[in-house]
A protein has these predicted regions:
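Active-site helix of classical SDR
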Residues: 7, 43
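A short helix-coil junction within the Rossmann-fold of NAD(P)-dependent oxidoreductases
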Residues: 9-18
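Alpha-helical segment proximal to the catalytic Tyr-Lys
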Residues: 12, 52, 56-60
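Conserved Rossmann-fold SDR core element
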Residues: 20-22, 48, 58-72, 118-121
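Residue(s) in the substrate-gating loop at a strand-loop-helix junction
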Residues: 27
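Active-site loop immediately N-terminal to the catalytic Tyr-X3-Lys motif
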Residues: 32-38
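C-terminal helical subdomain
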Residues: 66-67, 86-132
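Short beta-loop-alpha junction of Rossmann-like oxidoreductase domains
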Residues: 71-80
């Protein structure tokens, strides 16, 4: 719901100014569904669909960017309920993660574009991450 609440709060201001930029954060999980990740992937796909629909519905002066991080240093592996998958995810994350700073730089890249350029989607993942 956070993405929807953010849009609801900012959209009237952006429409009044006829200018603004949304930057929504999804995940590479919006492109892939695996065992035990169905609900997670569904929520991330929803963010992707909302972002794409919003981009098509708003004024041409309002930009909508979607950043889809791959394996990023976070608490995500700790939320996995299956013990085997959790152990595997933690081991993988130790070897194949990028920092939050890398994601912040992707956001900065999207924002820094000229006003007539909209970075619709940007997937950012570690070079070591081959799946997802």
């Amino acid at each position: 719901k956070g993405v929807l609440h953010g849009i609801a709060a900012a959209l009237p201001v952006f429409e009044e100014k006829d200018s603004g930029q949304f930057v929504n954060i999804s995940s590479v999980g919006d492109r892939w569904v695996g065992p035990t990740s169905t609900v997670y992937s569904a929520t991330k796909f929803a963010v992707r669909a909302i972002s794409d629909g919003l981009r098509q519905e708003v004024s041409r002066n309002i930009r909508v960017a979607l950043i889809a991080p791959g394996a990023t240093e976070s608490e995500l592996p700790n939320t996995i309920s299956d013990p085997e998958l959790k152990k595997m995810a933690i081991e993988t994350f130790r070897k194949e993660t990028i920092s939050g700073l890398a994601i912040a730089k992707a956001v900065a890249f999207a924002i820094a574009q000229p006003e007539d350029v909209d970075v619709n989607e940007l997937v950012v993942r570690p070079t070591a991450q081959k799946n997802l």
